[in-house]
Curated annotation (Swiss-Prot):
Keywords: Cell membrane, Membrane, Transmembrane, Transmembrane helix. It comes from Synechocystis sp. (strain ATCC 27184 / PCC 6803 / Kazusa). The keyword Transmembrane applies. One of its GO terms (cellular component) is plasma membrane. This is Uncharacterized protein slr1298. It is a multi-pass membrane protein. It is found in: Cell membrane. The chain crosses the membrane at residues 46-66, 70-90, 93-113, 118-138, 143-163, 411-431, 446-466, 482-502, 514-534. Belongs to the YccS/YhfK family. Its main location: membrane.
Length: 755
């Protein structure tokens, strides 16, 4: 029992990122400068109010393009001013005020349709609305603070825009190479194990970052400051990341195919090669950011020479054993792909060097620019309309926020608890669109608030000087903002300390009551959030994950159909259509990974369902990469006739994918896989007859024969077919375990999949 509880609450000790010292320093300056100005003018309270208003507005600054940040911060500023003005009318009529509160909180939650920026703008406006309702006064102190603070927040966020206009774009592209470099080093450290968790996380992160960088680059074309030539270079570098990743997939698959004893030296050399590639990619990331770091491929060249020597040794040791021939072809393929990879790296390095002087950039990459221009951004009103239905988790989130806000406001009104608006403030920061995220945020907030109240109950007895308390508060909020993405509990500890220090500076309520009120309001707000997230319009995480899995299998069926004509030797691959389906499959894989994270984080998920869900996610992504490897290899095929059993194999794969999808849709045990093992055996026997002929040809020093051409075309294909069969077996077993005790009654409908 205790072990299960520890597993459920393990997220409380887990960090989520790195400490953002830049944000902490910005927060400190944003609070300290107005406070010092207020002291100089004899009105430190106004200075503190301006600093607080600026930090409230800056909550909406989630990074990204300067233009997006400008729009987000300006929208939060205007929205906060309107919300604060509306908040002042709430006490005039309590019934009307309750209705207005519900409407404001619904709008706050529904703004999440615009992503993280929209969600934070909603939180800022709701916060301002609650402050307006709580601090109704005849003077204009709050509005003056908000007006000056909004302008100050814009200066803090984007003052560097004219000096480094393309820095967000550079950072986005540099992150691609940094993630790729870390992935390569992780693979080398894990001896190319496909099950290494760190490597798997980096693959998902790279896929997400590539998608985000493309979207960001598209958005940057809308008449923003900066040189368009530089954006063209950055687009080319994104394309190069894709090409490098494609080569690396092939290398990784080949290394995993042939785990032969006679290739131990080759494996050691490949580990060194992956480490060297990782260093080059990390240097490329620094180079994109404008730092003087020239990647060096000399070590890679030496490792390729060592592999070429191993190829000669394998050829000299060739006997009648098929494993010896497999060793030779493995080393040959590794050398060829490494050489292609080095050529691609050299082109990438040359492109990165042009970032120092974008005027030298020619129009040779107009095709890449065309890809960018074909992408269209949706109208701003489209997310509002497309999510306005009860199947949308974001609409349900808005309704939960509205109901929770009205319940919290009612409790605060009836109990007259001091600072009762903290109930609703807790709700807007804790309640998330899905239960698992709400539970994690709630637990972290309770822990941080409890520790903050405990420590401050002692500290406020020891420190009474208002000026010293002000500086301690500024330091506390700066630490809280810096730690917000690192660990939420620790950040809440400092934010709680800051809030209690503010109340101690202006003790309209005794400090002891403020401490108790903070804790009680947090508990009430958390209880409301937990109750709503668990029971009101809640979508099962099991259902969400199953829908994402069905979508992934549907895309894999379409993806496999793209390579069938080339696999059967009938026609070449339609690259444009294959790329389109591949992009849809990548999006489906990302959605499935997100659904998996939520499923694993949901405390109501049975532990026996977690392992098969994790296995399904990993192996469906691996199956997709296998299809991609086949397409990449078949694109360069010389047109040899395939093994006759390949046609039966393709039919069996199609049938397997269809059966697995049907099983998930109807939450039933999957039908048995077709007898692919027999088909694979027939393919191998046919293939080995060519290998035997080729061994004889090599001994007779015959090159460039039809036999060699066939083997060049189908060595990797046959091995990949074996891997596809094994992965389908694993997926079949995982789905059988996942559907063993179904919790869904009526099957899955894709049209209800969350957007």
């Amino acid at each position: 029992m205790l072990a299960k509880l520890r597993q459920r609450l393990a997220f409380l000790t887990r960090t989520n990122g790195t400490i953002d010292w830049g944000r902490g320093i910005r927060t400190f300056c944003g609070m300290a400068v107005p406070y010092l100005g207020g002291m100089a003018l004899g009105n430190p309270q106004l200075g503190l109010g301006v600093g607080l208003a600026s930090q409230l507005i800056l909550l909406a600054d989630m990074g990204g393009l300067y233009s997006v940040r400008l729009k987000t911060i300006f929208g939060a500023w205007v929205g906060a001013a309107i919300a604060m003005a509306v908040g002042t009318i709430v006490p005039d009529g309590w019934g009307l005020g309750l209705a207005i509160t519900g409407f404001v909180l619904f709008a706050s939650g529904y703004l999440a349709v615009y992503g993280e920026q929209g969600a934070m703008v909603g939180i800022v406006t709701t916060f301002a609305f609650l402050l307006g309702a709580q601090n109704v006064s005849t003077d204009s102190f709050e509005f003056t603070s908000l007006a000056i603070g909004g302008m100050w927040s814009l200066i803090l966020a984007i003052f560097i825009w004219p000096f480094r206009p393309n820095q967000p774009l550079r950072q986005m592209v540099a992150n691609n190479y940094s993630i790729l470099g870390n992935y390569l080093r992780a693979m080398a450290a894990a001896n190319f194990s496909p099950d290494d968790p760190q490597a798997q996380q980096l693959v998902v992160k790279l896929r997400q970052n590539l998608l985000k960088s493309r979207q960001t680059l598209v958005a940057s074309q809308r008449g923003l400051w900066g040189q368009s030539k530089l954006r063209e270079l950055l687009l080319v570098l994104i394309e190069h990341t894709e090409r490098l990743n494609k080569c690396l997939m092939l290398l990784n698959e080949i290394v995993n195919f042939h785990n032969l004893p006679q290739l131990q030296t080759v494996e050691i050399l490949m580990e060194d090669a992956f480490n060297a590639l990782g260093e080059v990619c990390l240097d490329l990331g620094q180079m994109v950011l404008g730092k003087r770091r020239i990647p060096n491929t000399n070590r890679l060249q030496l490792l390729v020479q060592a592999l070429q020597q191993q190829k000669k040794l394998q050829r000299q040791a060739l006997t009648e054993d098929f494993n010896d021939y497999n060793s030779l072809t493995t080393v040959t393929q590794l050398v060829n792909h490494l050489e292609n990879l080095i050529k691609q790296l050299e082109q990438t390095i040359q492109t990165a060097e042009l970032l120092q002087n974008p005027q030298l950039f020619s129009d040779n990459n107009s095709n890449d620019q065309g890809k960018l221009n074909k992408v269209r951004l949706m109208p701003w009103w489209d997310p509002l309309g497309s999510n306005f239905h009860l199947n949308s988790p974001l609409l349900r989130h808005g309704l939960r926020m509205a109901l929770g806000g009205m319940v919290g406001a009612t409790i605060a009104h009836l109990t007259q608890i001091p600072y009762g608006f903290w109930i609703v403030i807790t709700l807007i920061f804790v309640l998330k669109p899905d239960f698992s995220l709400t539970f994690q945020r709630l637990s972290n907030r309770l822990l941080g608030t409890f520790l903050g109240v405990l420590v401050m109950s002692i500290a406020l007895k020891l420190i009474q000087d208002p000026q010293l308390l002000s500086w301690l508060g500024i330091l506390a909020i700066a630490m809280g903002m810096a730690l917000l993405r690192f660990h939420y509990s620790v950040a809440v500890f400092f934010i709680t300390a800051f809030a209690l220090i503010l109340k101690a500076i202006d003790p309209s309520v005794p400090t002891e009551y403020a401490l108790l009120s903070r804790l009680v309001c947090t508990l009430i707000g958390s209880a409301i959030a937990l109750g709503l997230a668990f029971s009101f319009l809640r979508q099962s995480e099991n259902l969400r994950f199953t829908q994402a899995s069905v979508r992934m299998l549907t895309n894999l069926e379409q993806y496999f159909q793209q390579l069938i004509p080339a696999l059967l030797g009938k026609e070449s691959i339609n690259k444009k259509e294959a790329e389109r389906v591949r992009n849809e499959t990548r999006l489906a894989a990302t959605a499935m990974q997100i659904a998996l994270d939520r499923l694993l984080s949901d405390p109501s998920t049975p532990l026996e369902k977690q392992e098969p869900a994790l296995t399904m996610t990993n192996y469906l992504a691996r199956l997709s990469r296998g299809f991609r490897v086949l397409i990449s290899h078949l694109e360069n095929s010389s047109g040899s006739n395939p093994p006759p059993p390949i046609k039966l194999f393709t039919e069996q794969v199609q049938q397997s994918l269809e059966n697995l999808r049907f099983s998930l849709e109807h939450q039933s045990s999957p039908a048995a896989l077709p007898p692919m093992a027999t088909t694979i055996k027939e393919i191998r026997e046919y293939h080995q007859s060519y290998q035997a002929q080729r061994i004889t040809e090599i001994n007779q020093k015959q090159d460039f024969t039809p036999t060699r051409r066939y083997l060049d075309d189908f060595n990797l294909v046959v091995e990949e077919c074996q891997q596809i069969y094994q992965r389908l077996e694993t997926i079949h077993s995982a789905i059988a375990r996942f559907t063993d005790s179904p919790q869904l009654a009526n099957g899955i409908k894709l049209k209800s999949q969350p957007s």
